[in-house]
UniProtKB/Swiss-Prot annotation:
Protein name: Large ribosomal subunit protein uL2
GO MF terms held by the record: rRNA binding; structural constituent of ribosome; transferase activity
Keyword tags: Ribonucleoprotein, Ribosomal protein, RNA-binding, rRNA-binding
SUPFAM superfamilies assigned: Nucleic acid-binding proteins, Translation proteins SH3-like domain
């Protein structure tokens, strides 16, 4: 997978880059594995904004992805590699030997026609899913469960992976993409390999409208607001805000650590991210 640069026919296209989509083998999704997607616009069940600067964007069909990989010891064939508008990674359509069809995240090196398997008997190759206790130390994995049977929650974005660096009793130690080293129960499932579409990080949007297609709205600076809207707001003319940068609720920005020290999961973090 690679990117290509567009011809500068307008200011918005001058620096714009897009994916070549050369790995895509099918243009329409499997109808039985799709459903409608209601726009949330950053609101919760009370209708209040919980994620700012969200709204709009193109209409999408949601592809139902198998993050649990709980169909064990049944071989599957990769029928197609498809585009998914709801995530940065590509997805692979699997046809199982018993006739069932499922989508999974497409890792690097997985191609149409390949055979994959989930379970204890699976080989250590991209796309196969095993429990962490059955994966050799040093292997890179993605779609990692945090709780057994809940489904993968870590390393699902394009190009991401974690490395299994040790096993200690009932825990496996993983080095996460952020550099954090944390313990995860060895009975959790993970998929071997790195998530595909690794050149996604090289894409340049080129214009504001392309962000709007993705459902991202403009970010207004605090110093440009009124005093009632932000701690940095107000003042005559342009001002610096008069204090250190903070969030709209007064929490210091620029590197202030906000993680609660009382979290039970703190004992599972061996090394925090960002530390040498």
């Amino acid at each position: 997978m690679a990117t290509r640069k567009l011809k500068p026919t307008s200011p918005g296209r001058r620096f714009q880059t897009i994916s070549t989509f050369e790995e895509i083998t099918k243009s329409t999704p499997e109808k039985s594995l799709t459903k409608g997607l209601t726009k949330k616009a950053g609101r919760n069940n009370n209708g209040r904004v919980t994620s700012r600067r969200r709204g709009g964007g193109v209409k999408r069909l949601y592809r139902i992805i198998d993050f649990k990989r709980n169909k064990v010891e049944v071989p599957a064939t990769v029928a197609s590699i498809e585009y998914d508008p709801n995530r940065s990674a590509r997805i692979a359509l699997l046809h199982y030997a018993d006739g069932e069809k499922r989508y999974i995240l497409c890792p690097v090196g997985l191609n149409k026609g390949d055979k994959i398997l989930a379970g204890e008997k699976a080989d250590i190759k991209p796309g196969n899913a095993l429990l962490l206790k059955n994966i050799p130390v040093g292997t890179i994995v993605h779609n990692i469960e945090l709780y057994p049977g809940k489904g993968g929650q870590f390393c699902r974005a394009a190009g991401t992976y974690a490395q299994l660096i040790a096993k200690e009793g009932k825990y496996a130690l993983l080095r996460m993409p952020s550099g954090e080293v944390r313990k995860v129960l060895a009975t959790c499932c993970a998929t071997v390999g790195q998530v595909g579409n690794i050149h996604h990080e090289n894409i340049t949007l080129g214009k504001a409208g392309r962000n709007r297609w993705l459902g991202r709205r403009p970010k207004v600076r605090g110093v440009a607001m009124n005093p009632i809207d932000h701690p940095l707001g107000g003042g005559e003319g342009r001002s610096s805000g008069g204090r250190h940068p903070v969030s709209p609720w007064g929490m210091p920005a620029k590197g202030y650590k906000t993680r609660s020290k009382k979290k039970p999961s703190s004992k599972l973090i061996v090394k925090r991210r960002g530390q040498r």
